[in-house]
Amino acid sequence: MSRVGVVLLNLGGPERIQDVGPFLYNLFADPEIIRLPSPALQKPLAWLISTLRSGKSQEAYRSIGGGSPLRRITEQQARELQSLLRQRGIDATSYVAMRYWHPFTESAVADIKADGMDEVVVLPLYPHFSISTSGSSFRELQRLRQADPAFEKLPIRCIRSWFDHPGYVKAMAELIAAEVRNSDDPTKAHVFFSAHGVPKSYVEEAGDPYQKEIETCTGLIMKELAVQMGHDNPFTLAYQSRVGPVEWLKPYTEEALEELGQAKTNDLVVVPISFVSEHIETLEEIDIEYRELATEAGVVNFRRVRALDTYAPFIEGLADLVATSLQGPEVSLDAAAELPNKVKLYPQEKWEWGWNNSSEVWNGRLAMVGFSAFLLELISGQGPLHALGLL
């Protein structure tokens, strides 16, 4: 029987307060998170942003217990998936590969080789593909694969995205239905999907399918929810976690919540649609920041649907994805990360100016550089704005 290594890709998160700064640095040093005209700017900007954001981020992590639960939850998902696959007769071993914190992707690759796996299935714990999530993780794994002949020779199957998988859709609808039923009037409960945002240019310039997959996914979930509830509910899709001066996908969660509050929405059921595990963006950003904002805006009852975590139907859906992948052809990391031929995604060490991009992308990049220079002057206390008496 073939020994199958199942690699679960995820973001990672700081487990202690002292990990926050290094985690943020790793995050913003990734050119798929912030794109700059030269790789020489990436690390200095990552240092600057992580330094400036570290204090506020540390406070956020303190508010949820001092660290992210993401690793613990992801490892539990891996164990339960492994157990279920073995019950189905698949000799599988699960490995967690985090992009920006421990256990890093390099660790997963080392363990796969040490355990003598015969083939690999790569399963991102991001239901919806994006350059900045699954795409970045695929590229990192590909970089390691190309540098390691022993790993490169293993057959590999990559699952690009699974936003429309029936098991996932049904599991989400079940968790939403549980909260809708707790509303004062379940027929009028407003379902609010809050997805992690991405820069608008990713979609319009690079052809990132993220927005389309999110929109399709919410439609499928609402259709399944109607089947389970016996009626339709109003719903909204918005995008959270915007960073920097460039335009991101809209509507923004903050603005959408304010509008619903002004409309005197009585029952709001908030769904963290991009996230399959509890972490800082569910426990702090949604549960604390957005709850307060919505309440102040006029929302009466704010309920948040829990993340999937180790919900049994969800784990069964993941097992179905792996089993189906094993029955099909090999799918390379390059193929999984492929985008429409609008913009070439350069290797990180060869990132170049995007001469063929629109002026909006140029403006975004130049704005980021200018914004960085402004922040640097604020920190140093020296520069042209100080010389002119403007600061």
From Swiss-Prot:
Molecular function GO terms recorded:
ferrochelatase activity; metal ion binding
Give the GO cellular component terms, alphabetically. Answer: cytoplasm
Entry EC number(s):
4.98.1.1
What SUPFAM superfamilies would the database entry show? Chelatase, Chlorophyll a-b binding protein
Database matches in Pfam families: Ferrochelatase
The record ties this protein, via InterPro entries, to:
Ferrochelatase, Ferrochelatase_AS, Ferrochelatase_C, Ferrochelatase_N
The residues the record assigns to binding Fe cation are 196, 281
Asked if the Swiss-Prot or TrEMBL record annotates the protein with the keyword Glycoprotein, the reply is no
Question: Into which EC class is this enzyme placed?
Answer: lyase
One GO biological-process annotation of the entry reads: heme biosynthetic process
Key words, A-Z: Cytoplasm, Heme biosynthesis, Iron, Lyase, Metal-binding, Porphyrin biosynthesis
What catalytic activity is recorded?
A: heme b + 2 H(+) = protoporphyrin IX + Fe(2+)
Its pathway? Porphyrin-containing compound metabolism; protoheme biosynthesis; protoheme from protoporphyrin-IX: step 1/1
Asked if the Swiss-Prot or TrEMBL record annotates the protein with the keyword Iron, the reply is yes
**Compartments where located:** Cytoplasm
Q: Which family does it belong to?
A: Belongs to the ferrochelatase family.
Function of the protein: Catalyzes the ferrous insertion into protoporphyrin IX.
Give the protein name, as stated in the record. Ferrochelatase
Write down the species: Synechococcus sp. (strain CC9605)
Organism classification: Bacteria, Bacillati, Cyanobacteriota, Cyanophyceae, Synechococcales
Gene name per UniProt: hemH
